[in-house]
Amino acid sequence: MTKLGFLRLSYEKQDTLLKLLILSMAAVLSFSTRLFAVLRFESVIHEFDPYFNYRTTRFLAEEGFYKFHNWFDDRAWYPLGRIIGGTIYPGLMITSAAIYHVLHFFHITIDIRNVCVFLAPLFSSFTTIVTYHLTKELKDAGAGLLAAAMIAVVPGYISRSVAGSYDNEGIAIFCMLLTYYMWIKAVKTGSIYWAAKCALAYFYMVSSWGGYVFLINLIPLHVLVLMLTGRFSHRIYVAYCTVYCLGTILSMQISFVGFQPVLSSEHMAAFGVFGLCQIHAFVDYLRSKLNPQQFEVLFRSVISLVGFVLLTVGALLMLTGKISPWTGRFYSLLDPSYAKNNIPIIASVSEHQPTTWSSYYFDLQLLVFMFPVGLYYCFSNLSDARIFIIMYGVTSMYFSAVMVRLMLVLAPVMCILSGIGVSQVLSTYMKNLDISRPDKKSKKQQDSTYPIKNEVASGMILVMAFFLITYTFHSTWVTSEAYSSPSIVLSARGGDGSRIIFDDFREAYYWLRHNTPEDAKVMSWWDYGYQITAMANRTILVDNNTWNNTHISRVGQAMASTEEKAYEIMRELDVSYVLVIFGGLTGYSSDDINKFLWMVRIGGSTDTGKHIKEHDYYTPTGEFRVDREGSPVLLNCLMYKMCYYRFGQVYTEAKRPPGFDRVRNAEIGNKDFELDVLEEAYTTEHWLVRIYKVKDLDNRGLSRT
């Protein structure tokens, strides 16, 4: 089409083409901005959980769904093992395997690893499109395009969707927004068609991420608010009843979910609102058949009876255990101190910590300030759909403050409401912008408005443009510097500004894979379990699934005990090798010494570890120190000795004594010691990973060789 031909198109067609072009550019930007890690390093899986997801996806692609669904993994949680098919959300793996097989059907040969690496950026592009349609339903196409452009680069979402971040959240945010879009369409139309599509989107969400619980509580809450505000109608009744019935039946097809939608407390709100819908419909029917006096007497009687019966039945079901109580993670959302005081394994995960104020600006920047503007617009122009987005924004704001991981749930609604806010500000001032030539304006036109209306409008538009540009630069910088570094490969800047690569993790796992027996059992802290099984292909005792607190506690007890007591535990668990992460030489702060207090807390949280007390590992003044002032219990435990073995002879910095720990900024207190029950098997180039072999007893069990 020539340029002249384009200009001859009708205004509507030009408008459509321009929207399509902008939306396509946002989708391409969303994909490309997540590729920093691939360009800087290589096509590699990030973090810890993604390695398990990659391993299971590879098994599914090679062996098929039947074997995948019935897979018993004997490489994990030795000697217990783990049933894979019934303990995971399979949506991520099935999606990747389906894409892999479709590409191979068309003779596009691509490794399953590369499918996994690029899946999250691909779905982030789909998310921009869904965000556009969702925001368009709330305001207009202009707001939708702004929201799509914002979510394409928002760091709060990019943090879990960069190339290589192969985790459930990579596709779950798309599923969540798709479900919300279908729900709003169902609410607006009252159509079973849209409600059924919403149920299907919800089913995809359930199959992909445990965060579906937020969704199945938010939608009923929306319906309840519509009831309380007098907005409940036949449209809402049809939409919710269809979504709840179909969605519940479909969600129960996921093995890991099973009967939870009708048995667990997290799902009871949805069931209760479903019952309220039936009562509301019945009351409306009675109102149409009875006079006001009869209706009031009957209404009070029925409500009292139904309320009493429901409370009695609910209490009995809770007491008899037919309805399971809330899980620890759910309790920790309602009471942030619950996990810290009762379940240290949950509190030990960095993702479960409360969010700091600085994190909001770091992950959202401009959106923090434009979110209230969009919220104000929705309050000023209330509708059923806008009530939903208000509730989504307010609830996700609270939950993101309780748990930093849920910043991911907040980011999309921040983009939507900020897109609405920016669109409203720009459209308001654009109306005041007069682009006609000054010499052609009549004196009457000039005097009819305040003198500087045009200048104020121009200034505000320039200010908003500046804010949007700074938002883009900030998001790109955060993506590049903070969220595009795979934890499996570390990097740092040298004195001359060049990039230094630390590839110790893969070096260690490669050594394990090729230099240890295939049936070797490796003991490490649970953080590294998935990586060891995926990359070293060796049996591990605990991993990131953390389903058995007692087993993890036993590992923590071994790490926190003296060599003799630890040896008894290691022999009990048939351990062949022990792996620890140590950052004292390179300055890597996420090492096992810094995680050690969590090992102590978790180790002492069970009956077999009651003798382990956290205060024993502190100095008399309450400090955790690794130097000569440190606690003797700490300086003689297994973890300390494995990390600092031979370290007392190493010079780490100029003008510092040997054995100077660059993370703790201290000279270690216990330098001259030998290991009795372990022998050093391998230490990586930068001492980041240290592997020890457990010595065997001699034939009579009198000494170790």
Swiss-Prot record:
Q: Motif span (SVSE motif)?
A: 348-351
Q: Which residue ranges does the UniProt annotation give for the motif DXD motif 2?
A: 167-169
EC identifiers of the protein: 2.4.99.18
- According to UniProt, residues marked as the site described as Important for catalytic activity are R160
Under the heading InterPro entries, the entry gives: AglB-like_core, Oligo_trans_STT3, STT3_N
Q: Could you say which residues bind dolichyl diphosphooligosaccharide here?
A: R405, Y530
Q: What glycosylation sites does the entry record?
A: N537, N544, N548
Residue intervals on the Cytoplasmic side: 1-15, 142, 189-191, 230-234, 284-298, 380-385, 429-453
- Cofactor(s) the protein needs: Mg(2+); Mn(2+)
**What GO biological process term is on the record, naming one?**
post-translational protein modification
Q: Which PANTHER family match?
A: DOLICHYL-DIPHOSPHOOLIGOSACCHARIDE--PROTEIN GLYCOSYLTRANSFERASE SUBUNIT, DOLICHYL-DIPHOSPHOOLIGOSACCHARIDE--PROTEIN GLYCOSYLTRANSFERASE SUBUNIT STT3A
User: What protein am I looking at?
Assistant: Dolichyl-diphosphooligosaccharide--protein glycosyltransferase subunit STT3A
Read off the lineage from the record.
Eukaryota, Metazoa, Chordata, Craniata, Vertebrata
> Which gene holds the coding sequence for this protein?
STT3A
